[in-house]
């Protein structure tokens, strides 16, 4: 912000031109066009450097650019992808994380029961990756769970998308 004109060096100006969400060292910042030339990822990194801190991009690549579009960033291992079927952005969790979650159970619990819970959560997360990815992996999940004493409840792709739409208020449940 040190390069910003005096009118923009206030919290009022910051709040009027910047929307920011942050968790630990991960952040997502939307910057208005009006201030993007003097408040962007490069100037933020410079400001941090002036106070002895290092600011990195989420990939820790060291190749920072002034700004990127929503579809070019990730936040807390979630990307922002436009979904043509639903005509909106979805925030799928990194596919590697989704697939890995079924391999881990914490605590002193029934291993099969916790694995089923993880698979059900993973199946929902797969639905955020699109129909083709979902169908590919859910078929594998069903094949693996045939030997389980208890069976996971796997919805169809469309059912997961419907449930998610109700959950986030894009549809009103017929039950209400």
Locations of the language-model features?
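Core nucleotidyl-transferase/polymerase catalytic module
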Residues: 1-176
């Amino acid at each position: 912000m040190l390069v910003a004109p005096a009118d923009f060096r206030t919290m009022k100006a910051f709040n009027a031109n910047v929307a920011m969400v942050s968790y630990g060292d991960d952040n997502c910042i939307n910057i208005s066009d009006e201030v993007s030339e003097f408040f962007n990822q490069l100037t933020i990194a410079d400001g941090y450097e002036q106070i002895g801190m290092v600011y990195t991009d989420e990939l820790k690549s060291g190749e920072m650019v002034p700004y990127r579009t929503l579809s070019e960033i990730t936040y807390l291992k979630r990307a922002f992808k436009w979904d043509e079927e639903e005509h909106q952005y979805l925030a799928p969790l990194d596919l590697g994380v989704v697939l890995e979650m079924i391999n881990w159970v914490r605590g002193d619990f029934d291993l099969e029961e916790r694995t089923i819970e993880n698979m059900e959560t993973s199946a929902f997360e797969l639905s955020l990756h699109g129909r083709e990815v979902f169908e590919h992996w859910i078929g594998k999940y069903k094949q693996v769970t045939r030997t389980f004493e208890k069976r996971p409840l796997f919805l169809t792709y469309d059912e997961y998308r419907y449930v998610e739409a109700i959950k986030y208020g894009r549809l009103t449940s017929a039950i209400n």
